[in-house]
């Protein structure tokens, strides 16, 4: 699930070239996003390799697709409060680069998993479960999930924006696991 135009190009090319079946999921709200895209016709992004979008020391935010820019904005807000957040974009969910996520959690000891989808049976739930299984002894706070509202996704833009988590929710979640509130 790409979060940047470059990732969209690179992941799609990798999906096409892969010998196994691949489901490529795009976030429609990101179609108008602009950004750097390599001119290299052979540019690919390897499947199953996460991207550390921002390094940090106090908390890890795992976010995919539409939530990556939100997580980066939340990290900027929190930096002004003295909290350094690492932002990880898994980019693919199967294979999932859980090792990069776990290594970050081992360093920061706190994690928020952010996703726009429903809280029940979401990818964020699986990522949270994997973190609990592989990095429980490193956690100084419970894994905190921030997900979309548990409602059918509305088509009206104003309602859709209310159903998807924003910067404020992510900032509040990090403050909670950092015991700032």
Q: PLM ranges: what are they?
A:
Residues 20-21, 58:
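Short, surface-exposed beta-edge/turn micro-motifs
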Residues 19-20, 109:
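Residue-level detector of structured alpha->beta connecting loops
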Residues 28-181:
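Thiamine diphosphate
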Residues 1-18:
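Conserved thiamine diphosphate
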